[in-house]
Amino acid sequence: WTLLVQYSNLRFFGAGPEETYQDRKHAKLGVWSTDAFKDHAPYLMPQETGNHEDVRWAEITDEKGHGLRISRAEGAEPFAMSLQPYSSFMLEEAQHQDELPAPKHMFLRVLAEQMGVGGDDSWMSPVHPQYHIPADQPISLDVDLDLI
């Protein structure tokens, strides 16, 4: 979802506080607070960043505490999510951090699954098969959305 730029605060119950992926879950389960700007890792080459795994609920708010709460529906699996000042397209188009535009929106992703990132070493390690998402199998996401 594309949100107004002022909705940059993130509070969530999941694996954190740093970014986590299926193959990068060395984190504690807890309630964490951050914002989209702190969650964006300034890698030398802009790329996927800021994902959070095993999320039970997340609140995206403005400075007054108004916003959106996403929570897993009763009986549903935890989800993955991120809140970033850049879209996936913006990250793919930029070769360096200084090529990213000034943020005008926040980009909220809520995912049933997020593929692993690989990189067991620093030179082209692929994602291990157990962290792939099979394209021939159904995936479901069941969440509740509430205004706060």
Predicted segment positions?
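Beta-strand/loop-rich accessory regions of lumenal/periplasmic or secreted enzymes
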Residues: 1-148
